[in-house]
């Protein structure tokens, strides 16, 4: 059983996101460990990219900081290896399509060997029949990496049916329109949208984009099978808070405690 499947067996996972290399290698690894101590059950590691169009200003700046630290594909592998020395937490690579397309299928096998369990491509086209992304899904399967796929409030039925054939581990529901960022509350149709998705999917449905405090996390977990917190953590890294402070902050968001 994949580590991601195991994470959903007895709880609704708290998923955290950090941009790999933000603040440098050592700080990035220390902050990842801090989130694990703070109760995060699954960790998403962002592959820094020069044009992160799906992200809001907070995470865009994190991509810039990571690139300024010379973070590259090898750095991402080394971060995973460092975490695997002491932790069995499921790891998801959160990336744009272009960096992985340039690296080729062999890099997916390197990700698996380093300790990653899944890959989420934020801008990957979903194949209708045969198009440029279909070989990539096959390459993920061959590398034994789960493809994590996004759905939004505007995703139409025909696309959901295609996603259902491809997604493994969990479905990532983008609960807010627009880019990543901190929101004060969930959208008014959140519960309705989750119910709609359950008509199509048997895998867990996780909500992300905008969840930044205990109240919104608790509200999301009433309907979703897990939550993702990203921008709220990344904003703390921009301020260079200590790993100990990050652990405390993560605990303050987790409504299960």
Curated annotation (Swiss-Prot):
Q: Which UniProt keywords apply?
A: Amino-acid biosynthesis, Aromatic amino acid biosynthesis, Lyase, Tryptophan biosynthesis
What is the enzyme's main class?
lyase
**Gene that codes for this?**
trpA
InterPro entries recorded for this chain?
Answer: Aldolase_TIM, RibuloseP-bd_barrel, Trp_synthase_alpha_AS, Trp_synthase_suA
CDD domains per the UniProt record, alphabetical: Tryptophan_synthase_alpha
User: Active-site residues?
Assistant: 44, 55
- Any one GO molecular-function label of the UniProt entry: tryptophan synthase activity
Can you name this protein?
Answer: Tryptophan synthase alpha chain
Note one Pfam family from the annotation: Trp_syntA
What family does the database annotate? Belongs to the TrpA family.
> Which pathway, metabolic or otherwise, does it act in?
Amino-acid biosynthesis; L-tryptophan biosynthesis; L-tryptophan from chorismate: step 5/5
Q: Which GO terms describe its cellular component?
A: cytosol
EC assignment: 4.2.1.20
Subunit notes for this chain? Tetramer of two alpha and two beta chains.
Which organism encodes this protein?
Chlamydia caviae (strain ATCC VR-813 / DSM 19441 / 03DC25 / GPIC) (Chlamydophila caviae)
| Reaction(s) catalysed (UniProt annotation) | (1S,2R)-1-C-(indol-3-yl)glycerol 3-phosphate + L-serine = D-glyceraldehyde 3-phosphate + L-tryptophan + H2O
**What's its job?**
The alpha subunit is responsible for the aldol cleavage of indoleglycerol phosphate to indole and glyceraldehyde 3-phosphate.
């Amino acid at each position: 059983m994949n580590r991601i499947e195991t994470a959903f067996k007895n709880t609704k996972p708290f998923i955290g996101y950090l941009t790999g290399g933000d603040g440098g290698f050592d700080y990035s690894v220390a902050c990842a460990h801090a989130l694990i101590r703070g109760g995060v059950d699954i960790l998403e590691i962002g592959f820094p990219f020069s044009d992160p169009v799906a992200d809001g200003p907070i995470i865009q700046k994190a991509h810039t900081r990571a690139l300024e630290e010379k973070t590259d594909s090898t750095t991402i592998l080394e971060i995973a290896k460092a975490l695997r020395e002491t932790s069995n937490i499921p790891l998801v690579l959160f990336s744009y399509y272009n960096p992985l397309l340039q690296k080729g299928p062999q890099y997916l096998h390197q990700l698996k060997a380093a300790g990653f369990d899944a890959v989420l491509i934020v801008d990957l086209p979903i194949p209708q029949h045969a198009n440029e992304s279909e070989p990539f899904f096959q390459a993920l399967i061959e590398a034994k990496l789960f493809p994590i796929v996004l759905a939004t409030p505007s995703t139409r039925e025909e696309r959901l049916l295609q996603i259902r054939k491809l997604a493994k581990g969990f479905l990532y529901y983008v609960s807010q329109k627009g880019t990543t960022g901190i929101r004060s509350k969930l959208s008014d149709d959140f519960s309705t949208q989750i119910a709609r998705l359950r008509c199509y999917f048997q895998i867990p449905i996780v909500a992300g984009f905008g969840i930044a405090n205990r109240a919104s996390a608790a509200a999301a977990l009433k309907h979703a099978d897990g939550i993702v917190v990203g921008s709220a953590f990344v904003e703390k890294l921009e301020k260079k808070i200590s790993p100990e402070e990050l652990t405390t902050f993560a605990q303050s968001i987790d409504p299960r405690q």
